[in-house]
């Protein structure tokens, strides 16, 4: 031929291509005549390795044709095997590939010659059965999944949880708008959709517990609608050894207007200074009226004590300790009589 290479014996061959069938047949015929392989190699100008390989294959298979001996391995992942593997996986989702291989042999589905390898079983589980099992888990998850919650209502700043919005009784009030008193106020806690209570769903439980409590507390928005007079005094102070009752607190906060903006939602009432009015009247200024016409006859005054007049009126020297409710009743009566 016009192309090829020359070996050490002077013969021509093409690298990577099989020896022609005519030369192969001639090698077999000379071998059957009893000629040694080395002599056949010199006579036909074919390498000794090629002659030996052709003769060995002929003695083994009886064929002189080139190609792989025996062909490829027969297919072991038949539909029957895949079906049994799927059954094993559905019965025991945590089964291993080597356990499936042993069970295929134990159940007689395969024998030791055609049983799939562990890697083949893993590939079947990953490609053919994995999607089916995931789809089955998804379908079962959808069946056991509760109905979806309604979308969260959106406010201009914060989004509120759906249990509060679904109640319909607690509507958030944006800043600058007069607060809605009563049951239309928002919850006591500042709403935030990223808090732990909202994520875990504890807010509705805490609201129910606090709503059924025996000590009702005013809501955040209700604070701004309530008058300053409704707050009890923060602390009881003593002036000249006497107990200063909530009368001073009443005198301070009774001058404040009730229609103030919703500042009380964020600042506690006792921490705020009294608002300026047109005429500042000190609760300590002396009165021109006679003591007998001003404070005589009230039930809380201790008549047995020695009266002192630091403010131009009769006050007892010592007062017995009373509860907050008694002090508030007395302060209301004094305020009414003073007005």
UniProtKB/Swiss-Prot annotation:
GO terms for biological process: regulation of transcription by RNA polymerase II. It comes from the Eukaryota. SMART domains: PAX. Residues 5-61 are annotated as: PAI subdomain. GO terms for cellular component: nucleus. GO terms for molecular function: DNA-binding transcription factor activity, RNA polymerase II-specific; RNA polymerase II cis-regulatory region sequence-specific DNA binding. Pfam families: PAX. Residues 80-128 are annotated as: RED subdomain. InterPro entries: Homeodomain-like_sf (IPR009057), PAIRED_DNA-bd_dom (IPR043182), Paired_dom (IPR001523), PAX_fam (IPR043565), WH-like_DNA-bd_sf (IPR036388). The keyword Phosphoprotein does not apply. Keywords: Developmental protein, DNA-binding, Nucleus, Paired box, Transcription, Transcription regulation. Residues 2-128 bind DNA. It is found in: Nucleus. CDD domains: PAX. This is Paired box protein Pax-9. The gene is PAX9.
């Amino acid at each position: 031929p016009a192309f090829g290479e020359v070996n050490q014996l002077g013969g021509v061959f093409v690298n990577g291509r099989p020896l022609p069938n005519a030369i192969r047949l001639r090698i077999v015929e000379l071998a059957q005549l009893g000629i040694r392989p080395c002599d056949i190699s010199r006579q036909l100008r074919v390498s000794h390795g090629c002659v030996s390989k052709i003769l060995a294959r002929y003695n083994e298979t009886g064929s002189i044709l080139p190609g792989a001996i025996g062909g490829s391995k027969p297919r072991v992942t038949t539909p029957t095997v895949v079906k049994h593997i799927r059954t094993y996986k559905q019965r025991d989702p945590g089964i291993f590939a080597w356990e499936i291989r042993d069970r295929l042999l134990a159940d007689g589905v395969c024998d030791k010659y055609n049983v799939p390898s562990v890697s083949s079983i893993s590939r079947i589980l990953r490609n053919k059965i994995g999607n089916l099992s995931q789809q089955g888990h998804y379908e079962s998850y959808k069946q056991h999944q509760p109905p979806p919650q309604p979308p969260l209502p959106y406010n201009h700043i914060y989004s509120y949880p759906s249990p509060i919005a679904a109640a319909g009784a607690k509507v958030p009030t944006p800043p600058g708008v007069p607060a809605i008193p009563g049951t239309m106020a928002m919850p006591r806690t500042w709403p935030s959709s990223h808090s732990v209570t909202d994520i875990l769903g504890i807010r509705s439980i805490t609201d129910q517990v606090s709503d059924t409590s025996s000590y009702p507390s005013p809501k955040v928005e209700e604070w701004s609608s309530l008058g300053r007079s409704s707050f009890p005094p923060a602390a009881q102070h003593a002036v000249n050894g006497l107990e200063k009752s909530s009368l001073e607190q009443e005198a301070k906060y009774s001058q404040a207007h009730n229609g103030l903006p919703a500042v009380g939602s964020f600042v506690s009432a006792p921490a705020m200074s009294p608002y300026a009015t047109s005429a500042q009247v000190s609760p300590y200024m002396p009165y021109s009226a006679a003591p007998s016409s001003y404070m005589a006859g009230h039930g809380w005054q201790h008549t047995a004590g020695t009266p002192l007049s630091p403010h131009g009126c009769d006050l007892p020297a010592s007062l017995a300790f009373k509860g907050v409710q008694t002090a508030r009743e007395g302060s209301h009566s004094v305020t009414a009589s003073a007005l």
